[in-house]
Amino acid sequence: MLAVFEQSIGRPPPELSLPQAGIQKKEAKTREEIAESFKTWKQDSTFYHLFNGNFMAFSHGNENPLQPRSIVVMDDVFCIFSGALDNTFDLRKHYGLSRQATEAMIMVEAYKVLRDRAPYPPDQVIKELEGKFAFILFDSKASTLFLAR
């Protein structure tokens, strides 16, 4: 999974940084260079180009059958999901989704419900999830990026 937005990279706390002794810093790659590197590395990748040169990409290469990857776009909300939820039945029932709804669809619906209909922050979605997963969710209307692992 890969998502590139805007021109900045988050800085980790100093406690999580690697020692820089003797390491020369390389100049940061552009979004286009990152996309080309990913395409070269994962030739079967699928790209979703968003506004302002931003993009999301994923590949099924080397996919673990127990942790499948999927992507869905619903109502201008893009979601790349990797892994599996252990409580999909309960979540589908809670959000009124069909049995065919994938984990990515569940994530988008859960995000939209909390965003639109409840006075809760979107990170409340995480509390309901059980399983081993990671996702990148981008709401293009609200320009909101939400990810979890």
Curated annotation (Swiss-Prot):
Stem-specific (active at lower levels in other organs). It holds the Pfam family DUF3700. InterPro entries: DUF3700 (IPR024286), Ntn_hydrolases_N (IPR029055), TSJT1-like (IPR044828). This is Stem-specific protein TSJT1. It comes from Nicotiana tabacum (Common tobacco). The lineage of its organism: Eukaryota, Viridiplantae, Streptophyta, Embryophyta, Tracheophyta.
